[in-house]
């Protein structure tokens, strides 16, 4: 595990490997996992069947079509933790800073700041339709401006379980390199747990 994980940290990155490999890794990490209530923003292995992501339907789903950088690839106006963009490590390209979104929401989120992106993730991970319909008031409370097109996109988005761990964070929490690195470690452990069973059993 240690040898594999060391290599995966360096090579299982958005700019270092094929996008299909990254998507597979994100789906494997989301499969049967739940938010870690002791570590905000992280996930842990849940019960069998609690979050089914390793399926052809999920692979082909338009809701999981594109890879989203949570802290964007370009740190405009230094809105994000600068250490994520260290040129020697580039944590912003690692699995812990990536998730899956539909193409339209990914494009809309773009280079937005943490508060706005969090609102997107909270909408997609929301199970209560009444909270989705109240998106404008939620945005106003966070000091976030949403145009009518974005509001409609969010209202029409389908529920996605894999964003639950991020959606439980608050606008006052920090999306920084420490969290991203810990997310990457956790996700790689889970991926190894899944894949090693196929390789060695």
What are these regions (language model features)?
Residues 1-80, 84-91, 95, 100, ...:
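Intrinsically disordered, low-complexity N-proximal targeting/linker segments that flank membranes
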Residues 91-94, 98-99, 103-201:
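Long, cytosolic, alpha-helical-rich C-terminal regions that act as interaction/scaffolding modules
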């Amino acid at each position: 595990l240690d040898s594999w994980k060391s290599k995966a940290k360096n090579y299982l990155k958005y700019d270092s490997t094929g996008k299909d490999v990254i998507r597979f890794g994100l789906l494997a990490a989301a499969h049967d996992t739940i938010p870690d209530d002791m570590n905000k923003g992280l996930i842990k292995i849940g019960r069998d069947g609690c979050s089914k992501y390793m399926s052809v339907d999920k692979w082909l789903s338009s809701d999981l079509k594109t890879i989203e950088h949570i802290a964007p690839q370009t740190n405009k106006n230094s809105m994000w933790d600068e250490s994520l963009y260290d040129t020697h490590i580039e944590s912003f390209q690692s699995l812990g800073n990536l998730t899956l979104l539909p193409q339209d929401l990914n494009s809309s989120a773009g280079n937005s700041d943490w508060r706005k992106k969090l609102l997107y993730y909270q909408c997609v991970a929301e199970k209560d339709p009444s909270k989705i319909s109240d998106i404008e008031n939620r945005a106003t409370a966070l000091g976030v401006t949403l145009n009518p097109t974005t509001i409609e996109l969010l209202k029409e988005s389908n529920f996605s379980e894999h964003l639950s761990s991020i959606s439980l964070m608050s606008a006052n929490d920090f999306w920084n390199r420490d969290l991203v690195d810990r997310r990457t470690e956790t996700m790689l452990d889970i991926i190894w747990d899944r894949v090693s069973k196929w390789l060695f059993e």
